[in-house]
A protein has these predicted regions:
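Functionally constrained cores in energy, signaling, and assembly domains
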Residues: 35, 39, 44, 85-86, ...
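A short acidic/basic microdomain associated with nuclease active sites
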Residues: 66-98
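Feature for intrinsically disordered/low-complexity regulatory segments and propeptides
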Residues: 1-62, 68
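Intrinsically disordered, low-complexity regions enriched in serine/threonine
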Residues: 1-21, 76-79, 93-282
Length: 282
């Protein structure tokens, strides 16, 4: 009888494929994390810090994702790794092309695919995080659904990878519900001065001015609605080059991936802000 072997959704990036062991630090209350492949220190953390290595985390999350989705939903999956802090911080961005929803305004139609984001840090730079979102197929803007569509567990002494996988298995968010919300946004006109609105939401004159220019571009394509404004936000968090004028400073540090992720969190805060939410119920 042949074995029932489920194909992998992804292979872990080669640079992350190592184990971790710990050695005492000369600083009381701390320990060194040692990369078992290179035998070099990769972290300096509190003795109460507890985490698994990257392969254990990401493949464990994969198991949970596969367990609550239909086989056809997992076909042609697209994955992208973002890695920084000398491989101590890693993010896996998964897009499911076969899970999609059309968003239509009076001027434009686009398709949104489901997105799953997994973050992991072995040096205390981030918690164990799984988030759910989407990706706008028209412009490939990445979406995070906000603070309620996530699973987050800190690397404290009580952290259990087994429990995290169990929670992730039952935490699948309703993608259709997310997209129905986006459709409402596409049907909701912006009943405010966009420039003044951005000043209230962004709270940075320089950033607000550049965001206004980006919002005008999105409005010209999608119409003057709340989804167009949201698309301007997600453009900012998806790109950092001449396409949108929001380039990152070249600091010479290994932090660009983390900086772009911080932008996504910033956008989630803007969407949850009172000025944005007030216009949705006006």
């Amino acid at each position: 009888m042949p074995f029932d072997v489920t194909p992998r959704l992804f292979e872990i990036d080669e640079s992350l494929n190592y184990g971790i062991r710990y050695e005492p630090s000369r600083l009381s209350g701390y320990k060194f994390g040692i990369n078992t492949m290179t035998d070099k220190a990769c972290s300096h953390v509190s003795n109460t810090f507890k985490c698994v290595d990257h392969p254990t985390y990401f493949y464990g999350c994969e198991e949970a994702i596969v367990s609550n989705r239909e086989p056809h939903e997992l076909e042609d999956v697209k994955v992208k790794w973002r890695i920084c802090r000398d491989t101590a911080w890693a993010m896996l961005d998964i897009t499911l092309p076969n899970v999609s929803y059309k968003i239509t305004s009076d001027k434009h139609q686009t398709e949104v695919n489901e997105r799953i984001i997994l973050l992991h840090g072995i040096d205390g730079s981030c918690s164990n995080i799984a988030l759910f979102g989407g990706i706008d197929f028209f412009c490939t803007n990445k979406q995070v659904r906000g603070k309620y569509a996530q699973l987050k567990k800190k690397n404290t002494s009580g952290f259990s990878m087994e429990n995290f996988i169990s929670d992730l298995t039952t935490a699948r968010q309703d993608f259709d519900e997310h997209c129905r919300m986006l459709q409402v946004w596409a049907e909701t006109p912006i009943k405010a001065n966009v420039r003044l609105l951005l000043d209230k939401i962004v709270k940075s004159e320089r950033l607000s001015k550049k965001m206004y220019s980006l919002a005008q571009q999105e409005i010209s394509k999608r119409g003057k609605n709340m989804y167009a404004l949201y698309s301007a936000f997600t453009n900012y968090s998806s790109y950092a080059d001449e396409r949108n004028g929001f380039s990152l400073r070249n600091t010479g540090n290994d932090t660009q991936a983390q900086s772009m992720w911080n932008r996504e969190q910033q956008v989630a805060q803007w969407v949850d802000s009172k000025p944005f939410q007030d216009l949705l119920v006006a």
